Amino acid sequence: FLSRTPAFDHDLGFLIFCSYGNGYRLTQNPAYKQVILDTADTLATLFKPQVGTMLSWPRNVELFGGHNTIMDNMINLEMLFWAAKNGGNPYLADIAISHADKTMKYHFRPDYTSYHVAVYDTLTGDFIKGVTHQGYADNSMWARGQAWAVYGYTVVYRETKDCRYLDFVQKVTDVYLKNLPE
């Protein structure tokens, strides 16, 4: 695969791209760029092609009863797109697009509110269920996750120029804004 270093958690985009990404943007220090490229490769080890998404919590597969993908992972896609355009493996962009597409299909209810966690069969990739881990209830909108989706799908649209993502993020944003307190 892309990296010999396995990822033990999905939070690599949060931890690395926010800091090293801005560090590289401001200083052009090549050491920062290399950290980002290496981290993107490591994050890619969580991608399961049979599912089409990155696994979020490898240590919790048994707890959730399958391949678990959380909405937070949408934030990581920006680092994958960046790495693919800046000397990394172009396949990283394919991973980001696959993850966004599968998340768009199964992580949202018909009213465009999101689950915190989507659980997939580890062998077939079939969607099993949507649940919450940090939100109020499995059938409630998780506000923080909804915000992750707004940011993540805006990035996916910016990087792909595919209007499907723009249309989708507008609907996700509308339901989020509609549910804010007055």
Residue spans of the language-model regions?
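Glycan-recognition and catalytic cores of secretory/periplasmic carbohydrate-active enzymes
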Residues: 1-182
